[in-house]
Amino acid sequence: MKGPRAGDDTVATREVTILNELGLHARPAAEFARRARAFRADVWIVKEGQRFSAASLIEILRANLDRGARAVLEARGRDAEAALERLARLLQELKD
């Protein structure tokens, strides 16, 4: 790892289910990516064995997170636990 997230190898994971009626489409995905970039941690979405950067709108859209989709949020870095707590909560609260 490099950049501001380096120096702490704390790893956290959390299972999530997408509840938003329209899934994680462009608008909520952009908000999710913006918030993921705010942490001192690298955050990924793992779905069906594939890893997608949670900091990238394009990667989130590639994950095809429709309503009811299950995935794992994975974070590594100083803010790993806080990142997953807040991002999982965001997924619960997202409305179109």
Feature roles, as predicted:
Residues 17-67:
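Compact, glycine-rich, soluble single-domain proteins
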